[in-house]
Amino acid sequence: MAEKVNNFPPLPKFIPLKPCFYQDFEADIPPQHLSMTKRLYYLWMLNSVTLAVNLVGCLAWLIGGGGATNFGLAFLWLILFTPCSYVCWFRPIYKAFKTDSSFSFMAFFFTFMAQLVISIIQAVGIPGWGVCGWIATISFFGTSIGSAVVMLIPTVMFTVMAVFSFIALSMVHKFYRGSGGSLSKAQEEWTTGAWKNPHVQQAAQNAAMGAAQGAMNQPQTQYSATPNYTYSNEM
């Protein structure tokens, strides 16, 4: 088997850094989990874009007469939360769907609930926290309407992010409970060390993908539309 080369994030060649992770949805994720995994990846991308737009909103806030603290914090949140959210909650759910690991599911639930709380706080928008939320935006309309309109864009995006995060958390939790997952199972994986054993992870991945392929390729019994009667020659 060819060695997997890290391919994420895809960095330009002029940057003297190499990708840190290997990511291939079609190769790693079983078909029945592919759609949900990609949706969570798109949610991470939305979060990253929202943080970038928030930086623009805080710049408009600064130009309109707001303090420089918000712009500085917005820049900090962008460079901090973008990689941290990928490592802390997307990689665990990617690994959870890849290897059917209860420990990875629990790691996702713990960190993603924190992400949900952060998204709600960002949508609220407490002044001085480096986010263009509802409180900060509405209160700034009396100072500069133009800046407030620009600030309204990341405010709406933070709100959408919070709603989508709640929906995503509910969907993953419903799937996990429906598949028989539990906290005790995650604790068992932690105790036995199965969550970090590459051989166990590979076996779980192969079993999950094999079951999915078997379900799709299972032949269906064909029945003839014409009845076939067998008569005995004995009277």
Swiss-Prot record:
Topology Cytoplasmic: residue spans: 1-39, 89-102, 170-235
Record-linked Pfam families: SCAMP (PF04144)
Keyword Ribonucleoprotein attributed: no
Domain of life: Eukaryota
Species this chain originates from: Pongo abelii
Origin organism lineage: Eukaryota, Metazoa, Chordata, Craniata, Vertebrata
Signal peptide stretch: none
Chain's gene name: SCAMP5
Subcellular location: Cell membrane; Golgi apparatus membrane; Golgi apparatus, trans-Golgi network membrane; Recycling endosome membrane
Transmembrane segments: 40-60, 68-88, 103-125, 149-169
UniProt key word Transmembrane helix: yes
Cited InterPro entries: SCAMP (IPR007273)
PANTHER family: SECRETORY CARRIER-ASSOCIATED MEMBRANE PROTEIN 5, SECRETORY CARRIER-ASSOCIATED MEMBRANE PROTEIN SCAMP
Job of this protein: Required for the calcium-dependent exocytosis of signal sequence-containing cytokines such as CCL5. Probably acts in cooperation with the SNARE machinery.
Side of membrane Extracellular, spans: 61-67, 126-148
Membrane topology of this protein: Multi-pass membrane protein
UniProt keyword list: Cell membrane, Cytoplasmic vesicle, Endosome, Exocytosis, Golgi apparatus, Membrane, Protein transport, Synapse, Transmembrane, Transmembrane helix, Transport
One GO term describing the cellular component: plasma membrane
Alphabetical GO biological process terms: exocytosis; positive regulation of calcium ion-dependent exocytosis; positive regulation of cytokine production; protein transport
SUBUNIT field: Interacts (via C-terminal part) with SYT1 and SYT2; interaction with synaptotagmins making a link with the SNARE molecules. Interacts with SLC9A7.
Protein name listed in UniProt: Secretory carrier-associated membrane protein 5
Family: Belongs to the SCAMP family. SCAMP5 subfamily.
